[in-house]
Amino acid sequence: MAFKGFACFSILLLLSLFVSSIRSEETKEFVLTLDHSNFTETISKHDFIVVEFYAPWCGHCQKLAPEYEKAASELSSHNPPLALAKIDASEEANKEFANEYKIQGFPTLKILRNGGKSVQDYNGPREAEGIVTYLKKQSGPASVEIKSADSATEVVGEKNVVAVGVFPKLSGDEFDSFMALAEKLRADYDFAHTLDAKFLPRGESVEGPAVRLFKPFDELFVDSKDFNGEALEKFVKESSIPLVTVFDSDPNNHPYVAKFFESPATKAMMFVNFTGATAEALKSKYREVATSNKDQSLAFLVGDAESSQGAFQYFGLEESQVPLIIIQTPDNKKYLKVNVEVDQIESWFKDFQDGKVAVHKKSQPIPAENNEPVKVVVAESLDDIVFKSGKNVLIEFYAPWCGHCQKLAPILDEVALSFQNDPSVIIAKLDATANDIPSDTFDVKGFPTIYFRSASGNVVVYEGDRTKEDFINFVEKNSEKKPTSHGEESTKSEEPKKTEETAAKDEL
């Protein structure tokens, strides 16, 4: 009887331990939590670690958290294990690391190698499976060696863009230059190398040192023997983009679209209705123009109007203008041809190159009435209100969807009312999502961004607290004509400055 009791006790104990083990496994966090006390030490111990810079109030961070944890769990069993970590970059004690790594929005992920000596932006997916696949590739060699025809077929494939270096030996200046570029661009491009060009699946055998870039479009492969660092990088980047990038709903085209918009070249974009009667004729003529201008530092894209709503919103375009061509230069000047016809494409490009096409400015209409305390500025009125008015102007660049901008609006109204009897001061706002901004004067990377331009033209960014009294003090200090006295100041707002919303990109 005693034995049976002991047996029952043993079974219960084992079950308890088993359940406890399961619960422990369920509650275990695989993402390392870093702060100012352990950040440097932890990074220095890892040859490869990913760090998420986040803020607790950031909605995108909250959405990423469970996917990041799932990925960390799976990668913990990788050989060798890959570490994922996070740090609250909004915490005052941790802000030194946010500054060190130039964090401008949340979440931002960085890949740190060699104990933090090498830093790379994470540009991969934001769901668990994609994170795992991306990081497994990133943790491997920057360039894989091809030792057989079978391995070459596997690496190059039919749909991959791969730069393959061919060398007589795996050493020397050319090899070192190639490997350095592979390491630099490993996040966005695939690299391989071989001692025998006969393994390569396409093209005649090439004598090394040389680089053959394989691609599933246009001429299918292209060679280069220039191993100068800048020239080699330019070759890889430019050769990896189709002569004419296609922007539609096909996910296979999306990586090329991303590379197109990342290119520093002048970008020519034609948007048409792909199912329209003249679509094929338009695309054919556009490709002819692209072919004849391929050496003119122009990148070409043709987009289906139905799949390009984001581009339409960004450039301020209307569907009634389709088919259209818009050109964007590296200094952000834009040139627009709306309702273009087949026989106008070639001549319009010639006019553009001859400097005969006027710059297009994205702008909302100038408001018929502008009687509110905070004056509405649009691109077309920016010169008159800000640059040529001879006034001291505090201007907010905002986005309608930005929560911080919405909270700031009533405060700026109060500031404007306090200066209503001072004709030398203007408090203004501009919707930066609907109007072009002169980037050489105003550097707008997040919302809200606030600038002050004095009556004589001195421009300074506002970096103070977002309270009525702080704004008033700032304007009085920087104005070149002393404003009159103002009303009683309100109590300071407790809302801290945050930059979850970023203008340059959607963090997810």
From Swiss-Prot:
Residues at the catalytic site: 58, 61, 402, 405
State the superkingdom. Answer: Eukaryota
Give the start-end ranges of region Disordered. Answer: 474-508
Limits of the Thioredoxin domain: 25-140, 336-480
Q: Which residues form the signal peptide?
A: 1-24
Entry protein name? Protein disulfide isomerase-like 1-2
What processes in GO biological process is this protein linked to? photoinhibition; response to endoplasmic reticulum stress; response to high light intensity
Q: What induces it?
A: By chemically-induced ER stress response.
Q: Which reaction does it catalyse?
A: Catalyzes the rearrangement of -S-S- bonds in proteins
Record organism: Arabidopsis thaliana
Primary enzyme class: isomerase
Task: Write out the tissue specificity statement of the associated record.
Answer: Widely expressed.
List glycan-bearing residues. 38, 273
Function statement = Acts as a protein-folding catalyst that interacts with nascent polypeptides to catalyze the formation, isomerization, and reduction or oxidation of disulfide bonds.
Q: Where is this site: Contributes to redox potential value?
A: 59-60, 403-404
E.C. number, please?
A: 5.3.4.1
Name the GO cellular-component terms. Answer: chloroplast; chloroplast stroma; endoplasmic reticulum; endoplasmic reticulum lumen; Golgi apparatus; mitochondrion; plant-type vacuole; plasma membrane
